[in-house]
């Protein structure tokens, strides 16, 4: 049984990842802004999956909150552990760890999922909102990964799962820019970690049914065939982590989109992205 820390853990892909990790007998550290929702999710997961859950209410746009989560990632002495994804048979039989016990365990898997759509034109938008998005989707990913990796390397095992997007290859405003950074950063990290027993995986989902897209006003703008289910995305992501796969793009249709974006002239990509940005209220 390992321990996973998941940011953005109360909705969408992050919530589904938390559930699937719990079903594989991983203890959890759940991070999100709203304590009430965190406590509710933690209770549900602990009761139904029989694992220990610690919660950390943190706004990852605030440096002090990021520092608290980073401190949690540094917990644990260098000692051999169970590889990520290897659920021990004893996990289901043992009594769940308490939140205090979970808080003392080293983190085997860090999932950087927290993020949000800015939903405004850059030129006329609120710069404070842009800064907040940058802090959450770039700054926090950088800081939390930097906090987690040394201990994982010292223990000889661990994994980082960073959530990017197929929009990383488009030109859809600052959101796409943030996700492009996540993708490039994770690929570089994976190369750096080769041979250490620690892996880095970047998840590039397409449109996925969640509160994220509801808040961005995107739900009604795309046909049903364009949407993925969060449970399918999470399942593909965790399978990729267990294989040590660096890039995970769930579904054949988005693999095709990804390939087209890579070979299409950038001028064409910009025109298509500009049209999509208008439709999705960026």
Which role does the model predict for each range below?
Residues 10-12:
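Conserved glycine-rich cofactor-binding loop
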Residues 25-40:
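Conserved glycine-rich Rossmann-like NAD(P)H-binding loop of the short-chain dehydrogenase/reductase
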Residues 113-118:
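Conserved NAD(P)H cofactor-binding loop of Rossmann-fold oxidoreductase domains
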Residues 121-123, 129-134:
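Substrate-binding pocket helix/loop in short-chain dehydrogenase/reductase
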Residues 145, 178:
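Active-site helix of classical SDR
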Residues 165:
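Residue(s) in the substrate-gating loop at a strand-loop-helix junction
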Residues 190-256, 267:
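SDR active-site lid
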């Amino acid at each position: 049984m390992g321990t996973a820390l998941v940011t953005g853990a109360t909705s969408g892909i992050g919530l589904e990842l938390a559930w699937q990790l719990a079903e594989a007998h991983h203890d959890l550290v759940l991070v999100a802004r709203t304590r009430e929702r965190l406590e509710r999710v933690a209770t549900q997961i602990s009761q139904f999956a029989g694992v220990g859950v610690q919660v950390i209410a943190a706004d990852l746009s605030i440096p002090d909150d990021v520092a608290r989560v980073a401190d949690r990632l540094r917990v644990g002495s260098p000692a051999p552990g169970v590889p990520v994804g290897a659920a021990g048979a004893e996990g289901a039989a043992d009594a769940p760890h308490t939140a205090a016990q979970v808080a003392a365990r080293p983190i085997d898997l860090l999932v950087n999922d927290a993020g949000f759509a800015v939903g405004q034109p850059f030129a006329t938008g609120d710069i404070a909102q842009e800064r907040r998005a940058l802090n959450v989707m770039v700054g926090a990913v950088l800081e939390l990964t930097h906090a987690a990796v040394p201990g994982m390397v010292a223990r000889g095992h661990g994994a980082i799962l960073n959530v990017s997007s197929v929009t990383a290859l488009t030109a859809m405003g600052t959101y796409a820019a943030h996700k492009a950074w996540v993708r490039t950063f994770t690929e570089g990290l994976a190369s750096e970690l080769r041979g250490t027993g620690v892996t880095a995986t970047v998840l590039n989902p397409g449109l996925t049914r969640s509160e994220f897209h509801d808040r961005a006003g995107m739900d009604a703008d795309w046909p049903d065939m364009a949407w993925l289910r969060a449970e399918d995305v999470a399942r593909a992501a965790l399978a990729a982590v267990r294989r040590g796969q660096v890039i995970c793009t769930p579904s054949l249709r988005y693999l095709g989109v990804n390939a087209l974006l890579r070979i299409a002239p950038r001028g064409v990509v910009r025109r298509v992205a500009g049209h999509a940005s208008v439709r999705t209220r960026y």
